[in-house]
């Protein structure tokens, strides 16, 4: 095994570990705010504007059925609203309400504060993160390119 291959394997293991811990941290932040990570994700994908459930599901990499369940919860708590879709009468657009936007803003503020503390504890600066991002994106591009 080459050194590069060994380092690649370690990187993959560390990325999985980082993603898992980050996900659990997000779940904790959401729970403390009386939300779920799933609701937070759907609110986040709607922050750019109204979307259909299938469109939101594609963006999140989830099934439309799972996103529909979360949207149902968000509709019940007035976090989102269904508005007519001029392009498809049977597939309404789901839009954030003012309450949904406020919830998303609170969650984002809590998350940003937690991430800032993490970066300070790790002693990591923006340039280190940019380099790591460039490396990961090059690997992703290579994996996505046939050959």
Predicted feature residues:
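Short, locally clustered residues in the helix-turn-helix/winged-helix DNA-binding domain
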Residues: 16, 44-48, 108
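Charged, amphipathic alpha-helical coiled-coil/dimerization segments
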Residues: 72-131
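A structural signal for well-ordered alpha-helices, especially hydrophobic packing surfaces
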Residues: 19, 104, 140-144
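N-terminal leader segment of winged-helix/HTH proteins
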Residues: 1-33, 138
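C-terminal regulatory/oligomerization modules of transcriptional regulators
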Residues: 1-3, 124-147
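N-terminal helix-turn-helix DNA-binding core of bacterial DNA-binding proteins
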Residues: 25-66
């Amino acid at each position: 095994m080459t050194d590069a291959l060994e380092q690649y394997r370690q990187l993959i293991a560390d990325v999985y570990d980082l993603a898992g811990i980050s996900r659990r941290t997000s779940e904790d932040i959401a729970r403390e705010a009386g939300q779920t990570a799933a609701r937070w994700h759907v609110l986040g994908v709607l922050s750019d504007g109204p979307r259909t459930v299938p469109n939101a599901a594609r963006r999140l990499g989830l099934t439309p059925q799972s996103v529909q369940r979360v949207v149902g919860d968000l509709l019940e708590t007035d976090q989102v609203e269904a508005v007519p879709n001029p392009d498809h009468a049977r597939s309404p657009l789901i839009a954030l309400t003012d309450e949904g936007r406020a919830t998303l803003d609170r969650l984002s503020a809590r998350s940003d504060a937690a991430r800032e503390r993490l970066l300070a504890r790790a002693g990591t600066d923006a340039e280190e993160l940019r380099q790591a991002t460039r490396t990961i994106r090059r690997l992703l591009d290579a994996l996505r390119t046939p050959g």
